[in-house]
Amino acid sequence: MPAITLPDGSVRDYPGPVTGTEIAASIGPGLAKAALAMEVDGKMMDLSRTLDADARLRFITRRDADSLELIRHDAAHVMAEAVQALYPGTQVTIGPAIEGGFYYDFFRNEPFTPDDLPAIEAKMREIIAANAPFTREVWDRDEAIRFFEARGERFKAELIRDLPASETITIYRQGDWLDLCRGPHMRGTGDIGGAFKLTKVAGAYWRGDHRNPMLSRIYGTAWRDQKELDAHLKQLEEAERRDHRKIGRQMDLFHMQEEAVGSVFWHEKGWRLYRTVEAYMRRRQEEFGYIEVRTPQLLDRKLWEASGHWDNYRSHMFIAEVEDEDKVLAVKPMNCPCHVQIFNHGLRSYRELPLRMAEFGACHRYEPSGALHGIMRVRAFAQDDAHIFCTEDQIADETVRFVEMLRRVYADFGFPEFAVKFADRPTPRSGSDEVWDKAEAALRSACETAGVEFTVNPGEGAFYGPKLEFVLRDAIGRDWQCGTLQVDFVLPERLDASYVTAESGRARPVMLHRAIVGSFERFIGILIENCAGRFPLWLAPTQAAVASIVTDANDYAETVAARLKEAGLAVATDTRNEKINAKVRDLSLALVPNILVVGRREAEQQTVSIRRLGSDKQDSMTLDEAIATLKAEATPPDLR
């Protein structure tokens, strides 16, 4: 006789096995109508599933944020049905719900184009209107393989073959169409509603491997109501306007090319911006007691085997074989094993702890070409990486110190608010459950001490320890995970790190892995999009441009530019034989924040007319006043 505990703490007893649908109906007709799925002991399930034991149950309705994943998952299935109805012979592969929407990958001779989307969307609306129920079926593995092979669905057959032997093979039907799926789903296609839209097409390799067939991917977005959909579509339009790749070209900051996939060619202005961010982070790290080091790019396989990266991270590493020396080297994907080597070089004392070791380390990680995105997702990058070697008793204080530094950095870059996620043990991982229990408890305790509130991000920790993930929200409401703090008891053990205790014994340090901005490349992409290229003056790669009205003022324009440069400002000069309106237009398109216009009158009076980006108004002031004003505005926040 199952006893079902509801969120309000009340318990309902049932005489025998009971479905979620029956439980909802027993509570009331309103819930029976509103319930879309249920969460049973923390696991999402279809309402049709039968419960035959005591459980904690929560119903998911359209008011719950959890319903979004259900809506998007179901929409992906309906899109796949619509595609196969309209384009017979198309094979389906995988189609998950993702943040903000869903997608499905298809295999066909002709890739889809944006022109195909209206017809697919219309067919989806037909299927949704029919409100066919989602029905879960458990199939025999061999039967499922034979079924999909007979239908020419070789990708589905491959997926089933690769599932663990212990995995239950489940199929979901919606009317006459079916798909391999773990679920859960809502009651029927009608629960999706009409607040969805197909947004774009793209290419993707099967399983992200360029050696596999190229698939045609269709993206869509789905929401609980039209208001949410409209807001999201508006956000997408704004994101397109702010796209860092477009603005990067417009401002001449960087470019990417096929000969160096996933690597950035920084142009003069972009590199100036990069160095400004790096210099700021260097000053902040010095302020908070970090030493800076530099470690090698290529390291012997033996070190990566000892650290655990070879077993847990090799698929993301670039490997190089040295034939003459019979060695296998790897380009470092992260700096942590290298920092342990510096810690181990010589005898360490407890008096040296905490030791805060930082490196703007260049790292390389393999990412499938289809996953790369401008400078925001690359293969070659540098990050504000640091490792704190400390005792267990120092974890809480170091966490408080780190969070304070992080708050200042984010505020200075224009992100005064952030959220925190606690990422716990993943599979696979290094270290025993006992060690993980200890690490997770230490990090939770440190969060309490630091006053950090968090939500749990299950299974997303690093293979060597749990971590905090710090998530920024940008100007148009998008979230970006940048900072991390990870507690690691595993790596010091694996790499035999130790220090001399106060009692002259030996002990292992705890290793705190931390980053604030993370990848400089990605963070600069976020900065570009957050301010749409209109940087605060201290970050602007070109802080001012001097434009002459007439050629007679060219010499004075050069003098003004020289004075501004002497004051430490990044300055451009436009003395072309063009009309001033054309110069102002070109400099505005390049998003130069301050245009100093000079003509014969300004030259005679030693003044300038300043036009701010986006303003038609010009302010006249003496050259000395202009220099003082701009110099003050261009001073980095930590130096004011």
Curated annotation (Swiss-Prot):
PROSITE patterns: AA_TRNA_LIGASE_II, TGS. It catalyses: tRNA(Thr) + L-threonine + ATP = L-threonyl-tRNA(Thr) + AMP + diphosphate + H(+). Its cofactor is Zn(2+). The keyword Protein biosynthesis applies. Residues 1-61 form the TGS domain. It is an enzyme of class 6 (ligase). It comes from the Bacteria. Binds 1 zinc ion per subunit. Disulfide bonds: none annotated. GO terms for cellular component: cytoplasm. Residues 243-536 are annotated as: Catalytic. It holds the Pfam family tRNA-synt_2b. Zn(2+) binds at residues 336, 387, 513. It is found in: Cytoplasm. NCBIfam families: thrS. Catalyzes the attachment of threonine to tRNA(Thr) in a two-step reaction: L-threonine is first activated by ATP to form Thr-AMP and then transferred to the acceptor end of tRNA(Thr). Also edits incorrectly charged L-seryl-tRNA(Thr). Homodimer. This is Threonine--tRNA ligase. It comes from Acidiphilium cryptum (strain JF-5). The gene is thrS.
